[in-house]
Amino acid sequence: MLCGILCALALTTAPMVDRIEEALCARDRLNDAEWSAVPDKAALLEKRAQFKERFRRALGYHAIQRTPLNARSLGVRDYGAFRIEKVLMESAPGEFVAVLVFIPAAGRFAPPYAGFVFIPGHSDNGKAHETYIRTCELGARSGLLSAIYDPLGQGERSQGAGLRCADEHVRIGAYAALLGETTATYMLRDAVRVVDYLASRPDVDSAKIGACGNSGGGTLSAYLMVADDRIRAATPSCYLSSAREHLVPCGPQDSEQNFFDGFSWGFNHAALVLSAGCPVLMNAAAEDVFPVAGSRSTYEIVKTAAARAGMPEGWYELSVAPGPHMMSKIHRERAVAFLLRHLRGEVREVSETENFDFGGDDCTVTPDGEVSRLAGFTSVYEELERKFAAQGVSAEQEARNARGLVIRECGGTDCRDVLATLRGRIVEGERAVLRVGGAAEPGEATATLFAEGPRYVPRTHRSGKLSYYDRRGTDEVVAVDLYMSGRSLVALRAAELLTLAAELRRRTGFAPALVAVGRFATVAKFAVAAQADAFSQTKYLDEPKPFLDALKSRDYLSFADSGALYSGK
């Protein structure tokens, strides 16, 4: 009866979205304060090394296998001022990546070239997005070789689930979380393997490789500059702000941007910049969805820490361009100029004065425009499937792993409010039957678990572009906010079940029976795993498919049902 006693002692305040996010923002402020307080270079290097290693573990960087790239050139086209080589490579066996390599004109620039990887943002057409290929074109016209590729679910890299872009990223993340991974685990691997490919080219100086990206690609280029020491200069655009400045107006973003308990172990935008170990240009936009006020405040922290550490002038820079969230002409020019300065030692203005009018065929690598149609194709879902089978991932296993999370929720302040929703037949001396997830039958009791029905309270104001989770209008915002807090919506609901069980036992003299319907069967399994004697018996009706079966059939598995199950194991 430990859980019931702990819950009875707890204060009662429902974990509204505002309150969860305010706690995350407070932790982000603390992280900023810790970087602001770094006194000297030795302290900065120590803190950088600690964050870098923790971040690499969260990303799964050390688990990236350097399998054969099997890179194949599928043709080169000469555009006069530059050439484009179409390359097909594998970031993992059968996981094809379509790459465009922009090569400077040999008559003007001699190899080996300094180069950079460009990571596209959330565009359905991936590497073919106009502003992204223009960045690579400008780089080639200026003497830099670059490789731009399709991230998962974009361009030619549909994974066969009928989803695109952010929807695919979130779906991958829901499954990856059950393995202690994120979508970023797989997206970073792609970026690292493209750097491997660049470094293997005889026309590239492997000691002079940079990273560039916009929006979601700004996110991944920021991750890459921290994780991969081969990156010698980086220009993330339309991402680096401050986590709290973006979270409040826009809500949690798709899953490659969310880490389990990340704020507690130091995930923070200033940390990304100061832990990179290379020069960084923060490209921001005045009207960005990633608020420019956050970019400016983060840059002030970076400048202060850099000055105390004696970093070279111009090592870190902030550029604010007018206009909205996009890889604008100003961003392109400043990014290429920054890369030229730090990769080639050239200090000069870069102006974009002409562009080639690219057609669809110019940017397509595969014959049918889809890697999924190639012989030997392996989707990321098939890779996840193999891991699920090898590790025996199941609701029962996750419930056992998450026992500590459930007990912690019982001892907190959030689970007791459920008692106010308890209704139905409760008679002293008569065993109660508690039903969750469906309408109570005659003679049964029921209750409303958190973030269900009237107990779902969304953020009071969202002024920015709503996240995927907010747009769905479900409890997924709560689940992701709790996930980032090192908690679990499923574990919280399981704690509420145990609170209800303790109350029903107190009022009737018997442990209640439990009937759990639909996805609440998973919640019930968490509760039983945490306290086996809480219920006299349990019945599961209309259970969801086992995780592995759902993955095989490409069923969507929402964060509320699975991602929130991650136990931090």
Indicate where each model-derived feature is located.
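Primarily recognizes the serine-hydrolase "nucleophile elbow" in alpha/beta-hydrolase
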Residues: 193-265, 500-567
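Loop/turn elements at helix/coil->beta-strand transitions in domains of secreted/extracellular proteins
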Residues: 112-115, 142-145, 205-208, 229-233, ...
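Alpha/beta-hydrolase-fold serine-hydrolase catalytic core, especially in secreted/extracellular enzymes
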Residues: 11-96, 111, 283-433, 438-444, ...
